[in-house]
Amino acid sequence: MEAEETMECLQEFPEHHKMILDRLNEQREQDRFTDITLIVDGHHFKAHKAVLAACSKFFYKFFQEFTQEPLVEIEGVSKMAFRHLIEFTYTAKLMIQGEEEANDVWKAAEFLQMLEAIKALEVRNKENSAPLEENTTGKNEAKKRKIAETSNVITESLPSAESEPVEIEVEIAEGTIEVEDEGIETLEEVASAKQSVKYIQSTGSSDDSALALLADITSKYRQGDRKGQIKEDGCPSDPTSKQVEGIEIVELQLSHVKDLFHCEKCNRSFKLFYHFKEHMKSHSTESFKCEICNKRYLRESAWKQHLNCYHLEEGGVSKKQRTGKKIHVCQYCEKQFDHFGHFKEHLRKHTGEKPFECPNCHERFARNSTLKCHLTACQTGVGAKKGRKKLYECQVCNSVFNSWDQFKDHLVIHTGDKPNHCTLCDLWFMQGNELRRHLSDAHNISERLVTEEVLSVETRVQTEPVTSMTIIEQVGKVHVLPLLQVQVDSAQVTVEQVHPDLLQDSQVHDSHMSELPEQVQVSYLEVGRIQTEEGTEVHVEELHVERVNQMPVEVQTELLEADLDHVTPEIMNQEERESSQADAAEAAREDHEDAEDLETKPTVDSEAEKAENEDRTALPVLE
């Protein structure tokens, strides 16, 4: 039973592989789940990284180093060849027409290290070349050629990181080369009588590319399947012997990687021709001299760096750098700029200027490029990018807001709700600004804090300075806040007598108080009415000043902090206010009557005294 179960588990289903490939190909064509875009000759190919890494060693190594690259541009491969390789990767089919097309696909497959594609091309070449070999075998064995070489040069162009051409010269010594017709095909491509042929291949820019290209040169002469092996000619009369000394030179360079470019003056070696060329400048007699301090430098880059670091303010800049360029120096951090636009953008970091404004949400930016990025998010309403404010879009009218409060107030228009409530008159409002306007107009309540200073009046009497106070009632509690003293217009008052309370509380201190005339006496200030409604400020509405004898005297009255402890606000209703006003009117009427009695009393007394004197004179004198 166990053996049968094992056999059942080992069953294979070849159709499953085909089904998986078909599904992956459909996803690629419909651009679903693709995670890489390959750009070849300006054409975009969508694919899956896992599939490419499974079929190509090149992509396997590349995706290990660069895991987050969404776009990859491939150079050195034609668009047609890459399309065939992509189709082969997802369908296992090759649809190639013509030998030229097959050669392009072969080169691309070798570059991308797609071994399965190379095997498929080898099978195709064998099938196409089999009938031709049967017909031409006899002729090829009889034909031989002789090629006379006179110092021909095979040059290989190597692309480097600095994008400068590097040439490797291989000298082929004079001699006679005898090669069979099968092996001469490759040699004819790279050598001809009294000419130098360049074989250019730009497949990469790394150090290993030099070895790969050199190996590609020699591989054309050492392929075993072509049977065109080249050997040194030990006997000149042997027709089957060959003599190519140049190939030995190439093999010698391949065995010494570090000796590709050798300096004969100091015995140093370099892998890249650019480094070798820069090194050779150190042996040259040319030098760059600083005209200010007479220092000499072998390299131009070192000379320019010296001028910029030490002699920039003294004008030590080369003529090439001085033509039409101005140096702009930041006055805040002393940073220097060649372009005025960069200098102006840098200044905005210090000044905080933001001249570019969004027409939709009125947000301002220091750079125009930042505004353009913001407009993309602001116009579409999909939300701003990293570092920018979040946007809120109304699903009803598509309006966009950059703050939650604005968005919430806008939604009320569509819902019809009135969440803003006035607790004084029980009215409801849709917008918050409508409620604030109602409180200001109907109830005389403003949102801002209105400070009321105790009015101060100047006097000739020396008094102690006191800070003005504002009393604010909030939630049934009274808070006294100190404020700066504010001088107001002086009041014209007459002073009748010095109030005794002021003297007792030490509010008035003057050594010359006794010198004041008796007619000049200090009056008092009377506060008319104080509003103490809950939730509002307490402020002075009226100021009454008594006038006696119409004598203009500047009086300054002050409240001391010690007296504020005795101030206790009383909440009065409307009836208490009316009764207090009636009592005040009654007291004023009684005072007026007393004043009239005082005026009439001296007249009555004088008449009674006169009558008494007359009576005394009328009486006879008794002896």
UniProtKB/Swiss-Prot annotation:
Changing residue 601 to R: Significant loss of sumoylation. Complete loss of CBX4 sumoylation. InterPro entries: BTB/POZ_dom, SKP1/BTB/POZ_sf, Znf_C2H2_sf, Znf_C2H2_type. GO terms for biological process: negative regulation of transcription by RNA polymerase II; regulation of cytokine production; regulation of immune system process. It is found in: Nucleus. Transmembrane segments: none annotated. One of its GO terms (cellular component) is nucleoplasm. The keyword Iron does not apply. A zinc finger (C2H2-type) spans 261-283, 288-311, 328-350, 356-381, 392-414, 420-443. One of its GO terms (molecular function) is RNA polymerase II cis-regulatory region sequence-specific DNA binding. Changing residue 477 to R: Small loss of sumoylation. Complete loss of CBX4 sumoylation. A motif (Nuclear localization signal 1) lies at residues 137-148. Residues 573-617 have a biased composition (Basic and acidic residues). Keywords: DNA-binding, Isopeptide bond, Metal-binding, Nucleus, Repeat, Repressor, Transcription, Transcription regulation, Ubl conjugation, Zinc, Zinc-finger. There is a cross-link at residue 601 (Glycyl lysine isopeptide (Lys-Gly) (interchain with G-Cter in SUMO)). The keyword Transferase does not apply. It comes from the Eukaryota. A motif (Nuclear localization signal 2) lies at residues 317-328. Residues 573-623 are annotated as: Disordered. There is a cross-link at residues 289, 295 (Glycyl lysine isopeptide (Lys-Gly) (interchain with G-Cter in SUMO2)). Belongs to the krueppel C2H2-type zinc-finger protein family. PANTHER family: ZINC FINGER PROTEIN, ZINC FINGER PROTEIN 131. Plays a role during development and organogenesis as well as in the function of the adult central nervous system. May be involved in transcriptional regulation as a repressor of ESR1/ER-alpha signaling. This is Zinc finger protein 131.
